[in-house]
Amino acid sequence: MTLFSCLNKENFSEIPVIEYKSLQVKGSDIEVQISFTDGDGDVGFKDGEEQFPYGPCDEYHYNLLVDPYYLLDGKFVKGTVLDYSSKCYPKPLPDTGYFPDTLGYYYRLAYIVPEGKDKSLQGDIYITLNEVMNEFPNDTIRFSIYMYDRSLHKSNVVQTEAVITP
């Protein structure tokens, strides 16, 4: 994942706003580019910032989330896989008693230090989704992307275009 940012004297919302820019297939990987704005400049985590509510088992441990969806019977459904490697086991779903098994690509953006009086941030984020073309063979997939700032404001959700995997 690569992050580029620049400071502008503009009035952006304190709630992050993201915009989908592009998707490129690079071998078995996919690179997605989004742009973002944040009016109060509280994007990203400082080194070691893992206390509540950003701890490893907390809901806000990750601040950039990419969820895959695959085409099933003419509708896009969220990609799932059983993942027993997590140290944080989710609670069972109340209606079924089963555990959620959602697959996602989750990241922790690095802290960006706003400079000057204007703390607003604007920039581009490049996300590399490794081995995606192998994870969903012979499928049509797309991705939903959103982010959180340190004030726990959730951005809008954007979707990529669909990609057909070999």
Q: Can you annotate each of these PLM segments?
A:
Residues 2-5:
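C-terminal motif of bacterial Sec signal peptides marking the signal peptidase cleavage site
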